């Protein structure tokens, strides 16, 4: 059976589809599993041994559709369910099943704080999309595979971090999903251990300010600013070596879960009720439940729409770390 999975973006969402890839490949007889995604997310899936072929969306959806038509798929699993994936399914003209994104229920929660969302993780809902094919959840969690060239040797890290460290994935796609700088510093001080800051080029400036802050103090927190220095897969390699991961609601959180790292997940304007907490790994949720304005979006904003950003500014770091 030749099956196409579609999920065009983004990092975390694609990682959350990996159990579907695995169970289809291992539970269907003679399964040939293909995946369609955007070219910029190539590194997430390129080493996945359960995939037979990956198809990339560049600028032209028509080119991708023509490429997919030539494959003559038996079944399409749409885990994105938007206008472009509808165009793909319609053009291919084969049996398909799409995930229900529960957008109306999310809208009710965001706009009226009425919560009819199921107490169910998005991964389990993804797997239900494939139920007609006879597959079952194998309870193995998420997958993330790194090529040998992207494995970061431990001696690339400072000596202070080679015998154990905590990772902090400090980035996020939207500002309202990230702690402000002063709260990041407060968090790092509370952690009080050798700490690797992970993120992209957008986090470099704040990460350097955090490093300088602790460099000028006598503190147990020793900062290595890795932001902007490593590729996504290299950052994943660092996560895999960590003892504990702190993360905003972002892609690296799900990659950490794939490696079965313990995660402390930090939530601002979004909420765990959306069904995207760390999957099948030990985790703790840090969120401000004392305010009535969250969630204010199912995704995020460039700034707090009310101007006070209480979800992060008043967040309590009520956790304890043990040796």
Language-model features: locations:
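Catalytic machinery of carbohydrate-active enzymes
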Residues: 1-323
